[in-house]
Amino acid sequence: MVTPKIAAVATATPRWRYDQATVLRMSGYDDPRRMGFFSNSLIETRHLYMDPETFTPDESVDQLNERWRRGAVEVGTAAVARAIERAGWRHEDVDFLATTTCTGRVCPSLDAQIIKELGLRSTVQRVHVGDTGCASAMVAMQQVSNHVRAFPEHRAVMVAVEICSAAYFLDDRLESAVAHAIFADGAGAIAISGDGTGPEIVEHRTIFRSEHLGAMGFEYPGGRPRVVLSKDVRRIGAGMMKEMADALMAGNGLKTEDIGHFVLHSAGRRVIEQVGKVMSLDEARLAHSRHVLQQYGNMSSATVVFVLDDLLRSGEPAPGDWGLMIALGPGFAAEGALLRW
């Protein structure tokens, strides 16, 4: 059986880049606790699909949805186009496209929008993965990997695109303030085939802990998205990242010292710190997750693809190296993959 391989990774962001001080001013917070969410986040800059010349914080639900649609199609299409180009493919070479997002929805679905924008074949197969939160890039990546295992001659692309700036909610909840302090916009795409030149995707795995179902997600008062984010997420998430890492390693006869690279979702400063503690990882092994958080913020599902791209750009992986790629999402769920260069 063919082992799927990563042929290329690409990312895209909105054209507008904001520093934390600017976003804090836009949020209107003036109490020390909420201001601290911004200053203690480790984040320096974020890209947001918000034109500073026209944005106002009193958007209607319809205006939010339209901004999400424009941003998701624009940024998602850019990421897919770059991944296809980096893989050395033509647009008509793509046999399968998987799209995913949790910050908005459109019908016809996001995959149909991108197929039209890029002029992909009319026979391209596709699937859209929705509402699996920050872990959804890994869920979509698994669908693409499974497709390539079943059809080894096919060339497939996964794209995770999030416009988190279209999911803000102005109220007095601390959860909302945390969301405003960390979430950002971006898209990450991965091209996968049976003959790619990048790392092999050796195994995918999912772990659910339904007792934490309400710890993270969205609710929709008045039709407007509002983040649900329990303070327990950093504890739950770190523990589940370790559980996922242990499961992937044990199933393949590996130990922590055998893993050369950790591609971990940049959920937030405290989550990264807690992961380092429970998994006994030094700063060097968390460097790419920290760097992405610092420069881009938490882009929900797209973030882990940015971390993978950051690692690949560093040139650190060598033939024979093992890597773990793990993200967290509502459910509560950990989604992971074992990679081999």
Which residues fall in each region the model found?
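Condensing-enzyme catalytic core mediating Claisen C-C bond formation in acyl metabolism
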Residues: 1-70, 170-239, 243-247, 328, ...
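Short acidic, glycine/serine/threonine-rich loops at helix termini
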Residues: 18, 108-112, 139-142, 167-172, ...
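Conserved beta-ketoacyl condensing-enzyme motif
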Residues: 47-57, 61-131, 256-272
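Short, well-ordered amphipathic alpha-helical segments that serve as non-catalytic structural scaffolds
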Residues: 49, 71-87, 187, 236-252, ...
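Acidic-glycine-rich active-site phosphate/pyrophosphate-binding loop
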Residues: 106-120, 159-170, 214-218, 272-286
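Active-site glycine-rich loop that binds ribose-phosphate moieties when present
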Residues: 129, 139-143, 160-186
